[in-house]
Amino acid sequence: MDKRLLTIQDISCVGQCSLTVALPVISACGIETGILPSSVLSNHTAGYSGWTFHDLTEDMPKILERWLTEKVSFDAFYTGYVSKAQIPYILEIMEKAARPGALRIVDPVMADNGKLYTGFDEDFPQEMKNLIKDADVIMPNLTEAAFLLGQPYVAEGYDKAFIEKMARDLAALGAKNVIVTGVSFDPSKLGVAVYDGNKVEYYFNEKQAVSSHGTGDLYASVVAGALLRGKSLLEAASLGADVVVEAIKLTAGDKDHWYGVKFEQALPYLIKRLS
């Protein structure tokens, strides 16, 4: 039976993020991809003057009921931007629609640059802990890691001991494997710390001159797809970083393309790396 993944996150109709990234990227990895939209937005919330928003929480139990009737099941679950009220439904879906040994991959999307995103209150990190406590892989950035651990956000000046303690403390919340993104010990390098429950390893790229919207969603989607293709945790984490850098380079110089990265043009690179 071919592997099937369910990704649960919002649809921003324009803006190259969330489900509009996850579906094509994971499909390009050769994995059948089902979607469960958590909400629908006209566009993402970074840089636009406004947006529309439609919540889909009430649809989740109805969809699960239909899936159970049709005997629909999944080899993996990958969650992104979701609301506090949706987490209990998501946990039920992960329990009832799972094939044996199904992976739970959680990108705890809620914050960056020391602040929670618009729409999340200070209780949200506590609720997110319920989603990560039985996860196989979690992928917080430094800000999200700090919120999950109830610690102050440290943007720079940290060392390996700090990051490695952070990774182990996150695993102590229940996650089997941890990828901390946005790690840097050198101003010219940016990368990830990868903890497999035993040791912490690192992978770095040259730091790009621009900061781009949607790269976190691209990264998490590549990692999820690569894991389902049988790549190791470090291999998947490294490939995700390389694909993000490739997409940023393909977008560089196009001032009109401020809202995301041209990840579509990086898909041949991703496919080649997986072959």
Which residues does each predicted region cover?
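Conserved phosphate/ATP/ADP-binding segment of small-molecule kinases
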Residues: T118-E201, V210, L234
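Charged C-terminal helix
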Residues: L234-S275
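Short, small-residue alpha-helix embedded
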Residues: V210-L233, A237
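Short pre-catalytic strand/loop immediately N-terminal to key active-site residues, enriched for Gly-Thr
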Residues: C13, V200-H213
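Conserved N-terminal subdomain of the carbohydrate kinase-like
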Residues: D2-V106, M110-T118, A266, I271-K272
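Fold-independent oxyanion-binding glycine-rich loops
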Residues: I8-I11, S38, G80-Y81, D107-V109, ...
